Amino acid sequence: MEANTRSTGRLPAAFLTPGSSSFMDFLSDQSPEMLPGNRSLPPLQGAVEAPHGTTIVSASFPGGVVLAGDRRATMGNMIASRDMQKVFPADEYSAVGIAGTAGLAVEMVKLFQLELEHFEKVEGAQLSLEGKANRLSTMIRSNLAMAMQGLAVVPLFAGYDVDREKGRIFSYDVTGGRTEESGYAATGSGSIFARNAMKKLYREDLTEEQALTLVVQALYDAADDDSATGGPDVARRIFPIVTVITDEGFRRLTDQESSEIARSILERRLEQPDGPRAALL
C-alpha cells in the first residue's frame, strides 16, 4: 500500500475498490506478509518451547450447543498460565475454542472474527454456519507450514445454525480437514479423556442445564488424567470458561454461574471421585 496516503488523509485505492468479501483475500493481495501462514521461520534447533492451550469440549442439545474450555496453558512440563481464555465468540451465533500453540491460536481467532465481520459488512448478511466452518478450515490449512514445525493450531468450532434451527459442532485436524461431529466433541491434550466421559453420559434429549454440566464434568475427567488440563481451581477462584449458543445468540456464563456448576460437581466428587457412572445395560 502507498505510504504517502498518510499525509493526504485518504485511504489507499485498494480500500475503495470493490472486490472479494473475504478479508483474508484482501490482505493476501495488499499485505501478504501480514498473514500468519506467510511468515517464514528460521531452521529449528530442537523443540520449540511455546505456551500451548489444552482441552476444549462441546456438546449439543435440542435448543443449541455449548462450548467450554479449561484455563491452563503449558510450556513443556511447566504451567505457563492458570487463567488463559481459550473460548471466544466468532460472531453472534458461533464460537471457537482453541488448542495448540497459544499465541498463533489467539491470532487466528482474531483474524477469523475479522473475516466474518468483513463478510457481513460487504454482503449485508451473515455467512452461513457451513460457510464459517469452511473459512476456518482454510485458515488452519494456511498455517500448515508452521504446524509441520511443531506450531500447530487445532480449534473446535460450534454454533447455532439459524437455517436448520439446531446446534452444530465442527472439529479440525492440523491440515484444515473438517469433520462435523454428532452430539459432542473434544480437542486438545485431554480430549481422549473428555470424549470418553461424554460418550458415557451424553443423550440427545439433554436440557441446556444438563449440557452445561456435562461439559464441565468432561473437563474435570480430562484434568484428572491429563496433567496439561487444568481442573476447577477453588482456591484461586478460576473455573472453566463455559459458553452457550442458541437462537438468541452467543452467551458466556458469568464467573458466578461457572463456579456454581463446578462447585456442585466437586461436592458430588467427594462422594464419587470418579464421577457419575453410566448404567451397564
UniProtKB/Swiss-Prot annotation:
The formation of the proteasomal ATPase ARC-20S proteasome complex, likely via the docking of the C-termini of ARC into the intersubunit pockets in the alpha-rings, may trigger opening of the gate for substrate entry. Interconversion between the open-gate and close-gate conformations leads to a dynamic regulation of the 20S proteasome proteolysis activity. It comes from Streptomyces griseus subsp. griseus (strain JCM 4626 / CBS 651.72 / NBRC 13350 / KCC S-0626 / ISP 5235). The active site is at 54 (nucleophile). Residues 1-53 form a propeptide. GO terms for biological process: modification-dependent protein catabolic process; proteasomal protein catabolic process. Pathway: Protein degradation; proteasomal Pup-dependent pathway. It catalyses: Cleavage of peptide bonds with very broad specificity. Keywords: Autocatalytic cleavage, Cytoplasm, Hydrolase, Protease, Proteasome, Threonine protease, Zymogen. HAMAP family: Proteasome_B_B. The lineage of its organism: Bacteria, Bacillati, Actinomycetota, Actinomycetes, Kitasatosporales. It is found in: Cytoplasm. GO terms for molecular function: threonine-type endopeptidase activity. This is Proteasome subunit beta. Component of the proteasome core, a large protease complex with broad specificity involved in protein degradation. Its main location: cytoplasm. Coiled coil: none annotated. One of its GO terms (cellular component) is cytoplasm. Belongs to the peptidase T1B family. The 20S proteasome core is composed of 14 alpha and 14 beta subunits that assemble into four stacked heptameric rings, resulting in a barrel-shaped structure. The two inner rings, each composed of seven catalytic beta subunits, are sandwiched by two outer rings, each composed of seven alpha subunits. The catalytic chamber with the active sites is on the inside of the barrel. Has a gated structure, the ends of the cylinder being occluded by the N-termini of the alpha-subunits. Is capped by the proteasome-associated ATPase, ARC. Its EC number is 3.4.25.1.
